Amino acid sequence: YKELRYNPLLVKINYTRYWLETLWLTNNNFDKYISKNMEVVNHDNIKKLKKQYPGLIFALPHMGNWEFAIPAGNNINLDLLAVAEPLSNNYVLNWFKKLRESLGIEIIIGGKGQNTFNTLEEKLISGKDICLLSDRSVNKSGVAVEFFSNIASFPRGPVALSIKTGVPIVPTAMI
């Protein structure tokens, strides 16, 4: 395999692209455009699972612009909810929260003292479909896992929520 090298310019280009895409999301045609140019793979399996469980747990990686999952979920009648990590700038946090909720996804702000796990359990049982970024732990409670020959910290939340509720985890990615 080809060894990947860190390229600061590419990081800046990708970050700029993310912000431009995020600003573009405020365009009213966003949902139609994304839906027209997106293919949801295995949506029949998701529909079968929805008949068996009130809500589902979708495990997503930090890959692409995950707001694009909103029209995909809308197309197959999912009632989406996601957890956002708190930001130090409340103005930016509230702007992102309002933007995402205007696109059709409920946002819960996680963090210390928020009782996020119990809230997610209640929402899941009541029929919400939960999108959780699952490729990195944002606090010290993650599980150490060997990942590409290195030790990485992954969040416990998706697995713990699945075990407690009996709801399956649906690995999800957008490419």
Language-model segments: which ranges?
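Negatively charged linear elements and acidic catalytic determinants
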Residues: 1-38
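Soluble catalytic domains of membrane acyltransferases
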Residues: 26-175
